[in-house]
């Protein structure tokens, strides 16, 4: 995107002209926001990125506040806004909106969707097959938890769902200090009150480990930047202090997300300490790293051998990438804390598309992982040779990331016919 001081670019003007001339414009709307200079980053960009775009749309619909550069076919006769990503697939949007209209959900401003990997995105390469079959390397696919909704009246909003325009704007429109929130979905859902639904939104899987890591590290930095919301007092948009109304459960979510930044480092230190203590301790910690995913697949009824195989594979991948993740996660968390203190560059993030094809994560991991394990093996104990051999497997990671589009198999074809 260009960063002209006029607040728009030539490409945006041409896009608006195309929208005005298309015959299908009654089905599609377009808004182009003006850009302003961000005092935190020094760059010309839209106010508060995606969060600001939603707030600007809400204010236009509610109060006819128009600070857009260009708008095409935008009505003010809306009650709800549906939020999806470019790679999202949703088949029951009307039913999702109906959830918010139910009298029992009158206290909620947001209805959240459950995120799941798109079935046919697993055909891209070996990495997507492993990622999709296991529901992902991280806990993203398990965010939809009914226990907290039923017992604690608390749900998570991950950015895909539907919200009531008026209630959402009243509850969070002027609540947050500018240029401080990178990942806004969870914290907005927490303050606006979210109900999780049984409806699924399907998304494309990352097609390489580097793209997956770029997205995961942005999420991690966004979680750490929510650290101020653990305290009893917060700062609002105009800088005045206000009481933090988050529940203990919601604060626990924030704390656990921040704490998860140091899991890889803790496991790596435990692995090294166990190797010093003897082979029994080493293998115990190694098996512990593998155990939770594999046990979950074994205890699932009925037992799915394919799922069990994939659980073993990406549990092994977790160990292979452990040194890199310890370095990357800790570095990202510390960087976010430093930026919080300095109050600078808190809104900088690398998008999913911009990270496409990057090999920097793989290169760093190869150098750091293999060098560390080999050095320990030479200077200290031969048991570290096992670590060195394991970490050498990271050389195969780029092979999992090659773009090899496969044809849909017979199973996928049957699925298409039956849906």
Please provide the spans of the model-predicted regions.
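Internal catalytic domains of large membrane-associated glycosyltransferases
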Residues: 1-244, 408, 414-419
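Active-site proximal loops enriched in glycine and acidic residues that flank catalytic Cys/His/Asp
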Residues: 32, 85, 117, 198, ...
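Basic/Trp-rich segment in TM-proximal cytosolic loops or flexible interdomain/linker regions
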Residues: 129-157, 171-179, 204-377
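Alpha-helical membrane-embedded segments
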Residues: 287-294, 381-404
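Transmembrane-cytosolic junction motif
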Residues: 301-305, 399-414
């Amino acid at each position: 995107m260009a960063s002209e001081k006029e607040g728009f670019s030539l490409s945006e003007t041409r896009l608006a002209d195309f929208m005005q001339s298309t015959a299908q414009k009654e089905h599609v709307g377009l808004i182009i926001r003006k850009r302003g200079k961000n005092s935190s980053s020094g760059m010309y960009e839209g106010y508060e990125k995606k969060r600001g775009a939603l707030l600007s749309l809400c204010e236009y619909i509610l109060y006819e506040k128009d600070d857009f550069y260009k708008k095409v076919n935008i009505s003010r006769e809306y009650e709800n806004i549906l939020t999806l990503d470019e790679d999202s697939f949703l088949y029951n949007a009307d039913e999702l909106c109906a959830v918010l209209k139910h009298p029992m959900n009158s206290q909620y401003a947001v209805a959240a969707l459950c995120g799941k990997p798109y079935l046919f995105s697993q055909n891209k390469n070996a990495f997507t097959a492993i990622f999709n079959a296991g529901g992902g390397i991280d806990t993203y696919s398990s965010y939809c938890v009914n226990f907290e909704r039923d017992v604690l009246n608390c749900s998570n909003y991950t950015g895909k769902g539907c919200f009531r325009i008026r209630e959402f704007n009243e509850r969070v429109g002027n609540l947050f200090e500018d240029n401080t929130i990178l990942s806004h979905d969870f914290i907005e859902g927490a303050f606006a009150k979210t109900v999780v639904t049984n409806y699924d939104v399907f998304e494309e899987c990352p097609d390489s480990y580097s793209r997956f890591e770029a997205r995961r590290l942005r999420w991690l930095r966004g979680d750490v930047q929510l650290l101020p919301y653990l305290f009893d007092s917060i700062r609002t948009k105009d800088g005045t202090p206000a009481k933090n109304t988050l529940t203990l459960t919601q604060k626990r979510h924030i704390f656990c997300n921040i704490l998860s930044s140091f899991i890889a480092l803790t496991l790596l230190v435990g692995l090294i300490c166990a190797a010093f203590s003897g082979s029994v301790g080493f293998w115990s910690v190694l098996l512990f790293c593998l155990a939770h995913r594999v046990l979950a697949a074994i205890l699932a009824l009925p037992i799915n051998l394919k799922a069990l195989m994939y659980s073993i594979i990406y549990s092994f991948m977790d160990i292979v990438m452990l040194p890199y993740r310890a370095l990357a996660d800790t570095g990202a968390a510390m960087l976010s804390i430093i930026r919080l203190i300095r109050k600078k560059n808190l809104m900088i993030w690398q998008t999913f598309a911009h990270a496409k094809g990057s090999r920097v994560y793989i290169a760093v991991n190869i150098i750091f992982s293999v060098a560390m394990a080999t050095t320990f093996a030479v200077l200290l104990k031969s048991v570290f040779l096992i670590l060195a051999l394991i970490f050498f497997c990271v050389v195969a990671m780029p092979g999992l990331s090659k773009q090899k589009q496969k044809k849909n198999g017979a199973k996928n074809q049957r699925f298409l016919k039956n849906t």
